């Protein structure tokens, strides 16, 4: 069995630590905690790291395309590594959830998220596991684009770091238990 954990974000230092890159932040934390390093795969346009957990190969991926083209990378890697969409988990930001709230889901629509729209369009299904991390709605008068491409303020960054710890625990639990249902029961709340 092989699994792939994908964090969504935009490449480049300009976007580091922005709200839209919270998926990258989560995968960075996982990779660091598991003492794995990323290597750049220019063919697939992604940073990829891997390890074995309970005799299962786990790939950790950060697409180096922009968010709206994440599906190209995900589809190519699923095909290359012969990974089923049932063994895909995507971590990404969610505007409609309070800052720092996390929610695991088995399937669902894109909910307006362009990275998820791209993945659904390229893999042909909405049925893949995901972890959504709340970044909150823009303040009055701020555009959605400026909000998602903005950085977290100090208080929100503290909240996000707590959320990233929870995501780290949830993903590790998921990889040990091999069950999204059990993980959802344990970590959704």
Curated annotation (Swiss-Prot):
Active site, UniProt feature: 20
CDD domains xrefs: PTH
PROSITE patterns: PEPT_TRNA_HYDROL_1 (PS01195), PEPT_TRNA_HYDROL_2 (PS01196)
Gene3D superfamilies found in the cross-reference section: Peptidyl-tRNA hydrolase
First-tier enzyme category under EC: hydrolase
Residues noted as binding tRNA in the record, renumbered to the chain: 15, 66, 68, 114
InterPro entries registered for this protein in UniProt: Pept_tRNA_hydro (IPR001328), Pept_tRNA_hydro_CS (IPR018171), Pept_tRNA_hydro_sf (IPR036416)
Residues under site feature: Stabilizes the basic form of H active site to accept a proton: 93
GO biological process, one term: rescue of stalled ribosome
One GO location term (cellular component): cytoplasm
Highest rank taxon of the organism: Bacteria
Its EC number(s): 3.1.1.29
Record-linked Pfam families: Pept_tRNA_hydro
Catalytic activity from the UniProt record: an N-acyl-L-alpha-aminoacyl-tRNA + H2O = an N-acyl-L-amino acid + a tRNA + H(+)
Molecular-function GO term, any one: peptidyl-tRNA hydrolase activity
SUPFAM superfamilies per UniProt: Peptidyl-tRNA hydrolase-like (SSF53178)
Keywords: Cytoplasm, Hydrolase, RNA-binding, tRNA-binding
Residues the UniProt record annotates as site (Discriminates between blocked and unblocked aminoacyl-tRNA): 10
Compartmental location: Cytoplasm
Similarity field: Belongs to the PTH family.
Oligomeric form and interacting partners: Monomer.
Entry-linked HAMAP family: Pept_tRNA_hydro_bact
Its job: Hydrolyzes ribosome-free peptidyl-tRNAs (with 1 or more amino acids incorporated), which drop off the ribosome during protein synthesis, or as a result of ribosome stalling. Catalyzes the release of premature peptidyl moieties from peptidyl-tRNA molecules trapped in stalled 50S ribosomal subunits, and thus maintains levels of free tRNAs and 50S ribosomes.
The protein's name: Peptidyl-tRNA hydrolase
């Amino acid at each position: 069995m092989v699994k792939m954990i994908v964090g969504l974000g935009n490449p480049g230092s300009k976007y580091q630590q922005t709200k839209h890159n919270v998926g990258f932040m989560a995968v960075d934390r996982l990779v660091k905690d598991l003492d794995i390093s990323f290597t750049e795969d220019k063919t697939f346009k992604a940073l990829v790291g891997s390890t074995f957990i309970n005799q299962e190969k786990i790939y950790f991926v950060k697409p180096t395309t922009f968010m709206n083209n994440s599906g190209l990378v995900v589809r190519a890697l699923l095909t290359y590594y012969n990974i089923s969409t049932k063994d895909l988990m995507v971590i990404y930001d969610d505007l409609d959830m309070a800052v720092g709230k996390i929610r695991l889901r088995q399937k669902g629509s894109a909910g307006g998220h362009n990275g998820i729209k791209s993945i659904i369009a390229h893999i042909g299904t909405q049925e893949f596991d995901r972890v959504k991390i709340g970044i909150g709605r823009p303040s009055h008068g701020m555009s959605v684009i400026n909000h998602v491409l903005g950085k977290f303020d100090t208080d929100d960054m503290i909240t996000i770091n707590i959320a990233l710890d929870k995501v780290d625990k949830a993903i590790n639990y998921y990889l040990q238990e091999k069950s999204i249902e059990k993980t959802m029961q344990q970590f959704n709340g």
